[in-house]
Amino acid sequence: NLKIAILKGIDIRIEADARLEDLIIVDKKSKKENRMNFENKIQRITYEERFNEIIRKGKILHLDGDKKYANKSIIYYKKIGLNAVVKNIPENKQAKIIKQLLILYNPDILVITGHDGMIKNGELNNIFNYRNSRHFVETVKQARNFSKINGKDLVIFAGACQSYFEALISAGANFASSPARILIDFLDPLIVAKNVAETDNMK
């Protein structure tokens, strides 16, 4: 019988399957080096924020389809002093609950992310060729419509690895991934949120 493994990225937002016979076990040294590189990246950002003594007031609501990344995001936001609420919500349920969360938390910045990916190469303009882009698009639409009705200038980042960038922007996202349909770093959405929170109109 064919045995399939489900692979999840540690620092890259990817979830994929592969045959066991195609996999190579990573040695402990390589895993340790990768972990240290990632931790050093976070430490550099944290040091820069402390050095600059930036005060942030933009409130962030972060929806993440992956529980592990949601928990890591909480740690990251706390380390650099961002005012963030992180919720682990499956991609296909985010649109159903977004209005309720916007009412409850009244954020200035909304991050909508999780896992995504193209099913077949080449079909860039077919939203059904993406694992979760249609769910992200619907969540963006719901959030943008709600913000317009309530006169809120909500800044939205949406998407994950290989998401349908153009559809997300058309739906109302200010920032989205990924225009080149590439894999994105776990930190990418968080860094965008951080930069927006530091802008003058958020202070």
Give the ranges of each region predicted by the language model:
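Basic/aromatic-rich interaction segments and small domains that mediate binding to polyanionic partners
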Residues: 2-21
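Long, low-complexity intrinsically disordered regions
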Residues: 29-88
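Functional beta-strand-loop-alpha-helix junction segments that form "active/interaction loops"
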Residues: 82-103
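Short, charged, surface-exposed secondary-structure boundary motifs
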Residues: 95-97, 185-195
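Proline-aspartate-enriched helix->loop->beta-strand connector
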Residues: 102-115, 173
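A short, glycine/acidic-enriched catalytic loop
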Residues: 119-136
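Catalytic cores of nucleophile-dependent amide-cleaving enzymes
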Residues: 135-184
